[in-house]
Amino acid sequence: MEANDSPHDVAVVGMGCRLPGNNNTPEELWRSILQKVDASSEIPRMRWEPYQQNAQNARSIGKVPRRGYFVKNLENFDAGFFNISPKEAEQMDPQQRLVLEVTWEALENAGIPLSSLSGSDAAVFMGVNSDDYGKLLLEDLPHVEPWMGIGTAYCGVANRISYHLNLMGPSTAVDAACASSLVAIHLGRQAILSGESKVAIVGGVNAIFGPGLTSVLDKAGALSSDGRCHSFDDAASGYGRGEGAAVVILKNMAEAVKDGDHILATLKGTAVAQDGRTNGIMAPNQKAQELVARKALDVARVDASTIDYVEAHATSTPVGDPTEVSAISAVYGKGRSPDKPCYIGSVKPNVGHLEAGAGAVGFIKAVMSVQKGILPPQANLKTLNTRVNWSEGVQVVQDIEDWPSSGYPRRAGVCSYGYGGTVSHAIIEKYIQTGPAIYSKEQWPKGTQVLLLSSPQRRSLETQAATQAEWMSTVGKQNDLRCVAATLGTRRSHHKYRAAFVVESHDDAAEKLNAFACQTPTKWTTSGGKPEGDDRPVVWVFSGHGAQWTDMAKDLLQYRVFRDVIESVDILVQKEMGFSAIQAMEMGVLNGSDQVQVLTYLMQIGLSEVLRSLGVSCGAVIGHSVGEIAASVAAGCITPAEGTLIVTRRAKLYRRFMGAGGMALVCAPLEQITIEISTQNVNNLVVAINSSPSSCVVSGPKEEIEAFALNLNNKGIKTIHVDTDIAFHHPMLGELMEPLAEALVGYVSPSQSKVAIYSTSASDPRSTMDRGIRYWLDNMVNPVQLTSAISAAAEDASPLAPIIKKILSMESRGATIQAIAIDISSHDAASQLSSRIDDLCFPPIRGVVHAAGVLHNEHVLSVTPDSFERVLAPKIAGSLTLNMLFPPKTVDFMVLFSSCGQFFGFPGQASYASGNAFLDALATYRRSQGDNTIAMQWTSWREIGMAAGSEFVRAELATKGITDISQEEAFQAWMHVSKYDVDHAVVLRSRALEKHEPLPSPLLVDIAIHKISSILTPPPTPPLSASSDLLPLPRNPADRFDSLSRQVRECVANVLQMETDEVASQEPLSNMGMDSVMTVHLRGRLQKSLGVLVPPNLTWSHPSIDHIVKWLMEKTNDKE
C-alpha cells in the first residue's frame, strides 16, 4: 500500500463542529449520519421577533419558510473564558462567538496546547457569508455602539480567533458563498505549503437571525417547501437552510509527524475555480465542476480511479443535483465496473445546508469516513432522482457499507460550490503511519492514572468534570485510559484553576468526576488555583549509591520512553558487565555493588527522559557520587553511551574492593565527625560525603566502620549502615585511577553543558572543568561535596546572585570591594565610619555617593513625629554624616540620590519629598562652597532600588507618561550630567521614546503651568459631580476601602454588563474584557460616583479593582 510521502501532503490533525441536532463534536455528527438522522426543526421562536414589531414585515414573515436546521441555544457563549465582557459579547455576531468556541474545541481535538501557538505564524481562514445579526444591530441607529463595528464585520470571524489566540499568521474571512469554507481549506493548505504558516485553522460558519435572505432564496426557488434537504431524491425541490460552525486544523505534515500528532487524514490536494458565464450567475456549470475536480486530482497526484467516495455538494435543487452527479460521473465514474462504482453521498439531509460552512462539514464527514473505513448511508432518500443517469459509474450509499478493499489507501473527494460561480474540490486520503509512533500508550504504565482538568474560571471546572464524566462512561470507554491521561496532561493548555483525579478505571474516573461536579470530591481528587512562582526552573539532583531498592525500575519499563533509553545501551552493558540491564530490571534483582552502580545510573538517565517526555525540564543539575554521571548526561556534557562506559568500566574495577569496605550515614555535622575520627584514632576512616549541614557519610574498611558506628550509637549519635560493601570515595581507591584512565582513553569526548551543572567532586561547586577522564578519576576518589553544591545552586537562584557575580567580576579585574554595615543616621555614625575606613588602610577616598533611603507612604495628615523622623533620618542625618566626614572640596565628587517624586506631588510621599528636598539644598550649599556635588533627581530604576518594588510609584509615573530606566541608561545620564556645572539634574524617561514619538516641549509643561497657576490664583473649589448628593465616605480606613471597593465593583460591573459578584477584585480588568473604549465609560462613571478627577490611563497604570481602590484611597484622602 502506498504511503503518505508526498511533499505536497498536509496533515489533518483536528476537527470541531457545532451543528443542528446537538451534533457538537465530529463523533456525535458521525453517529447521527450513521443513524440517518434528519435534524430539521421549526425556527426558534425568538429569532425573527425583532421583525415582528413592524406590521408590514410581520405580514411578510408569515410567507417565509419557517423550517430549517438550527443550533439550539445559539445565544449561549462563555465570554469570560475568552476574556470578553458580556457587554462586548452582546454586540458580537454569534458567528464570531461560535467559531471562537469551536476553534478551541478543534485545537483540543488536535492535542495542540494554545500556549504552543501563541505568537506563532498560524493562519486563520474562515468562510462567512451572512450578516443577519449585523443588520439587526446597525440599522438600530439610536443604539449603535463602538463594538458593533468589529463585532459584526466579516473580518471579525477570522480576526477574533487570531486576536484571542495571539496568532501572527494570515487571518482572513472568506466569502465565496456556499463554497466559502472549502475555499478556506484550500487557502490554509496553500499557506502551509508555501511556508507561510505551520498550522492553519480553517472552516466556516453560518447563523440565521433574519428572514431576509431566507425570503430571497425562497423566491429564487432554492429552498424546499418542507425546509428539509433531499439530496439525490426524486422529490428534491430545494434545500433547507442550516446553521452552525465547522473548523478543521491543518498542519505541516513533517511537523505533525515530528510532534507525534494524531493525524486524522492526509489532505492530498485542493483546487478552486470559477464557472464563468453560464445561463445565469447562480446557475451551475457541469464543465467547471469537472475541471476543478480534475485540477484537484492533478495537484494531489492521484488517479480518479483510486477515489472510492465523493462527498457531494448536493443542495437538492432540481438543476443542481443532476448537474453535479453528471460532473462526478464524468470524472470519477468513467471506466468503472458496475460492482466497483464511485460511491457518493451528502451530509446536508442530516444537518442542512450551512452555506458558508457547508464545505467544511462535508470535509469532516469525508475525513471520518476514510479514517474509519465505513461508507455512511444517505438520509432522506426514498427514490433516486430520475433526472440522473445512474449507470455511469456512480452510486449513492443507501446503507452502511465497509469501504471497498483495494491496493491503495482509502481516498475521497469533497465538492463545494457557491451560487456566485465559485467551484472548489478537495482530495483526502487515509493517513498511513510509516514509522513507530512517537507517542503511544505503551509509553504509559498500566494501572492508576492521573486525569488533569483546568480552566481560566473556577466555576467552569465543575462543568468540565461533568462533561468528562459523561464521555468517560460512554464513548470514552473505547479509549485506553493511559492515552486519555496522556492527552489531558501533555496536550491541553493548563489554566489558572485546576483539578486532578487519581483513577483506576473508566468507571472510577466517571464516578470521581461526577462527585467533583456535584461539589462532593473524594480524597483522591485535588483542586485549586495555579500556585505563584511555579514557573521557576528546578534543579534535578541525582542520588548516589545506597538509594537503590528491590524492583527498582520494574514499573518504569512500561514507559516506552524509559525502555527505549535502557535498550539503547543494554548491548554495551551486556558486553562490559556480562548481564542484561533490561532483564535485571524486569526481575528486580540487584546482585552486588558493581551491578547496583550500573543500574542506578541507568535508572536515572531513563527517568530523566520520562520527565522530559512529560514536559518537565530542569534549569540545573547536581550529581551525588555515581549520580554525577547521569547528571552529566542530563546536562548534555556526555552521551548516554559515554556515561554507560564510564559507569561499567569503573564498576568492573570496583570488584577488586568488593567485600572489603563499608560506609555509614551519621546524623551529625561533618566538623563534629571529623573530630570524632581523630579522637577515636581510627585514621583509616574518612568523611566521604558532606551530605547536609546536619549529616555526613563515613567510609573505610568494613570492620573499622562497624566499630565506629557502634561507638557513635552508644554516644547517642544516630548512625545508619549504607547498603554497600565498597568504601567509595576513600583514598584506598586511588590505585584504580590509572587503570580507569587507561580504560576510558578515546571513549569520552565531553561537550559544553546545556544547563547549569554543579560539581560535587571539585572544591569549587561552580567549577567549569569539563567532564573528561580527569574529572571521573576525581569523582571516584574525592569526597562528595553535596552541601556545597546545593548551597551554590540556592545562592545562584537568589536575586542577589547577579549582584554577587558583578562584584566578583570587578574583583577579578583588580578592584577591592569592602562592605561596612553601620546606621548612617546614628549620632556616632561619622566616628564609626571614619574608624572603619582607617582600619582598611585604603588610599584616600576620592568620591562619595549617598543612596540611602526609606520609603514609607503615608497621608500627610497621618504623619507622626516618629514616622517623619524614620523617613528623614537616612536622607538628612545620613547626608550630614557624609558632609562632616568629607567637607566641601575634600573629594573629587559627591552624588546625592534624590527623587523626581517631589515635582509631581505623589500622594503619601510628603515625608520622602521633604527628605529629598534637603538633599537638593545640601547639593546647592556644597556647590556654593566650590565643591563638585550634584543631586540626581531620579525616576524609577528598573529592577533595582526602592521604587522598583513599588507598583504605586510606577503607576503614578505612568500617569505622567514617564517610564522607568535601565541601569545602563541611569549611568549614561550620570556621566552626561557630570560634564556640566549644575547642582541638580532631573532624570526622566518619556513613554514617547518607546513609541518613537516627538517629546513634549517643554517636557514638564503641565507641572510648570500648575506651579505658576497656584502662585497667581488661589486654588478653586473642585466642583461636585452632576449628582450633588454624593455618598460620604467613611473616615475609618478599612471601612473606606470597603466602600470604595464596592462602588468601583459596581461601576465596573455596569460597564462590562456583569453581575457585581462576578467581578473579581484582584483580576486584571483586561482579563474580564475591559478594552480601551470601555475604560472611557468607566472613567466617567467613577468621576460621577466619587467626585474625583480620574486620569485617562487609569486602568493601564492600575490594572485591577484593588489597584484602583488603593489609588482612590489616596485621592479621596486628599479631598478631606
From Swiss-Prot:
Gene3D superfamilies to which the protein is assigned, alphabetical: 3.40.47.10, ACP-like (1.10.1200.10), Malonyl-Coenzyme A Acyl Carrier Protein, domain 2 (3.40.366.10), NAD(P)-binding Rossmann-like Domain (3.40.50.720)
Residue numbers bearing the O-(pantetheine 4'-phosphoryl)serine modification: 1076
Annotated ranges, domain Ketosynthase family 3 (KS3): 7-430
Domain Carrier stretches: 1042-1116
Region named Ketoreductase (KR) domain: 804-943
Pfam families named in the record: Acyl_transf_1, CurL-like_PKS_C, ketoacyl-synt, Ketoacyl-synt_C, KR, PP-binding
Region (Malonyl-CoA:ACP transacylase (MAT) domain) location: 539-796
SUPFAM superfamilies to which the protein is assigned, alphabetical: ACP-like (SSF47336), FabD/lysophospholipase-like (SSF52151), NAD(P)-binding Rossmann-fold domains (SSF51735), Probable ACP-binding domain of malonyl-CoA ACP transacylase (SSF55048), Thiolase-like (SSF53901)
Induction: Expression is positively regulated by developmental regulators veA and velB but not by the global regulator of secondary metabolism laeA.
Cited function: Polyketide synthase; part of the gene cluster 41 that mediates the biosynthesis of an extracellular and diffusible metabolite that is able to stimulate colony sclerotial production.
This protein's name: Cluster 41 polyketide synthase
Organism: Aspergillus flavus (strain ATCC 200026 / FGSC A1120 / IAM 13836 / NRRL 3357 / JCM 12722 / SRRC 167)
